Structures are given as C-alpha cells and as structure tokens.
C-alpha cells in the first residue's frame, strides 16, 4: 500500500464506522500499540456538555460555551474519558448529557471551538482519532484512514454481549432493529453522513476478533510509515 498524500510531521490515523462496529475499542488499542495519543470525538462533545452542566452555563449561551470548550482539561487514555483529571466515562453516557451535547452543538462558535480542540490533540508521536468527519474535515491529510464495517448481525451480537456484561438486559431482535434504524438515519442525514472517506481503507470486522482488527490497522500503518 502506497501513501496517497503527503505526510504531516505528526501522523494521524482516523477510524470511523457504524454503531457497534468496534471503532472505539480498536482506536484505543491501536493508539496503545503505537504509543499514540487518542481522540474520541463523540465523547468530546459529551464532555463539553457535561462541563456546561457542572459550570452552570446555559445551553443557548454560545459565547460562554465556546470559551468553556477552549479551556477544558480533557484527556483520553485507553478508552477512559477524563475531565479535569477525573474519570467521567460513565457520566457522559447519560441520556440527558447526550441530549445536551446535541443542543450545544448547533451553535457555530461551539462547533468551531470543538474543531480546534480536536485538532489540538495532534501531538507527537502521533494520534489515533475515532469518529465522524475525522478523515474528511478534521484531519484530511491523515496518514491512514480506516472505515470499519461489520454485518448488522455481528454488531448486534457484540452489543448484546457488552450489555449483558454490564448487567443490563438486552433483546437481540430489539438490538437488530435499533441498529438498522440507526444505520439508515446515519447514512441519509445531511450533515456528516455515515460513509467512508474516498481514500479510506475498508475493514470488515464481522469475522475478526478485536486483536485481529487492531493488527490489521497497525500493519497498514507500518506499511505506509516503515520506521514506525
């Protein structure tokens, strides 16, 4: 596999894919394998939402929200989201925080501040960025762009296992229906539709273990950047 674009001094690997394709897990493990920084862009929006609640900033105060986004101390380590040094991985998954994230993201100043924060994660020795628009808008010059795919059945099985392990009840038929509906919404929406970048590598993980998927991504990257 040959490089198709000039490399930035600090390399980026972007990973996208549909819900329950394993992109978050794969991104975290690839970052750990290569010693790269990690960015979970979806979690970043939720972190901003959580902070706005904690600092009592109104969801319609665009200027104050944008200022807050620029000042937050945020880190991602092995899939753990930290805000001001505290693990808030569970807190940001609350439904009300998800709704708040959608509410604040409609403001152009907030989106601009979040884009700047995402790009600021690009530091030596490199970055693995997980999320929509990473390879098309945020890091169009990424060294490697990966789009994970998997059958809806495989993804539902994974999601079912995750929920059971966390102590939640789960129905496979409901999960299958929810994933199909989510895929349709994501692929047809006007803003950031679910589709791979034109120069992305497609990786079907239906029959792959997490370790196998990680190994393939790392192999692709090292083929492009042999000294890595």
From Swiss-Prot:
Gene Ontology biological process terms, A to Z: nucleobase-containing small molecule interconversion; pyrimidine nucleotide metabolic process
Location within or outside the cell: Cytoplasm
EC class name: transferase
Pfam families: Cytidylate_kin (PF02224)
One Gene Ontology cellular component: cytosol
Binding site for ATP: 17-25
Catalytic reaction(s) noted: CMP + ATP = CDP + ADP; dCMP + ATP = dCDP + ADP
Keyword tags: ATP-binding, Cytoplasm, Kinase, Nucleotide-binding, Transferase
GO molecular function term, any single one: ATP binding
NCBIfam families registered for this protein in UniProt: cmk
CDD domains: CMPK (cd02020)
Stated family: Belongs to the cytidylate kinase family. Type 1 subfamily.
InterPro entries found in the cross-reference section: Cytidylate_kin (IPR003136), Cytidylate_kinase_dom (IPR011994), P-loop_NTPase (IPR027417)
Superkingdom of source: Bacteria
Protein name as it appears in the record: Cytidylate kinase
E.C. number(s) listed in UniProt: 2.7.4.25
SUPFAM superfamilies, alphabetized: P-loop containing nucleoside triphosphate hydrolases
């Amino acid at each position: 596999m040959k490089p198709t674009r000039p490399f930035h001094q600090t390399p980026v690997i972007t990973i996208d894919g549909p819900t329950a394709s394993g992109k978050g897990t794969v991104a975290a493990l690839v970052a750990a394998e290569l010693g790269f920084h990690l960015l979970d862009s979806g979690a970043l929006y939720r972190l901003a939402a959580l902070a706005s609640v904690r600092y009592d900033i109104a969801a319609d105060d665009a200027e104050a929200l944008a200022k807050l986004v620029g000042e937050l101390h945020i880190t991602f380590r092995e899939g753990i989201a930290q805000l001001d040094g505290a693990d808030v991985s569970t807190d940001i998954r609350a439904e009300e925080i998800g709704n708040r994230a959608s509410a604040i993201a409609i403001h152009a100043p907030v989106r601009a501040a979040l884009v700047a924060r995402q790009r600021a994660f690009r530091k030596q020795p490199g970055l693995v960025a997980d999320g929509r628009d990473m390879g098309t808008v945020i890091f169009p010059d990424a060294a490697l762009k990966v789009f994970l795919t998997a059958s809806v059945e495989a993804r539902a099985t994974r999601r079912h296992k995750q929920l059971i392990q966390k102590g939640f009840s789960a129905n496979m038929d409901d999960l299958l229906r929810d994933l199909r509906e989510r895929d349709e919404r994501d692929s047809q929406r006007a803003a950031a539709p679910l589709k791979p970048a034109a120069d992305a590598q497609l990786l079907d993980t239906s029959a792959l273990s997490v370790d196998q998927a990680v190994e393939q991504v790392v192999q692709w990257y090292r083929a492009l950047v042999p000294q890595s």
